[in-house]
Amino acid sequence: DIRCRIEGLASYYAAKNASPEGLARLRHIMDLQEFYFEKRDAEHLREMDDQFHDVICDMSGHAVISDTLVPLHRKTRRYRKASIADASRTAQVVKEHRAIFDAIAAGDADRAAALTTEHTIHAKKSMIERMNNHG
């Protein structure tokens, strides 16, 4: 629950503080993520997922957000990797990331925060399901 709120705050501030350079980095990651999705390359998709969230943290301009989320991302990496291996979840992740990117690019901080919170809730549910089914 804490991660969901902090991820939402990261996107909120990323939308408020978005620079052309930050948006270009995020757009490039989105393009690569869509490319790797088409190739069904789960390993690179996970890397793009990590980078997507890391760039949003950077764009937020808040060190406390980055200092809090980076260790959480490391702790959940194994489960996020397993979740991304699921093709149906991967398709949803790509779609959710695109919507988050669009909100950040539009400067719509409230929408970016809401979409990111929703995305993180979906990821959490997927991770819990994976842990329950696969230990």
Regions found by a protein language model. Give the residues of each.
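Conserved amphipathic alpha-helical segments that form helical-bundle/coiled-coil interaction surfaces
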Residues: 2-5, 9, 16-82, 95-101, ...
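Solvent-exposed loop and edge beta-strand segments that line ligand/cofactor-binding
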Residues: 85-89
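Short acidic-aromatic low-complexity motifs
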Residues: 104-107
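Short arginine-rich
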Residues: 121-131
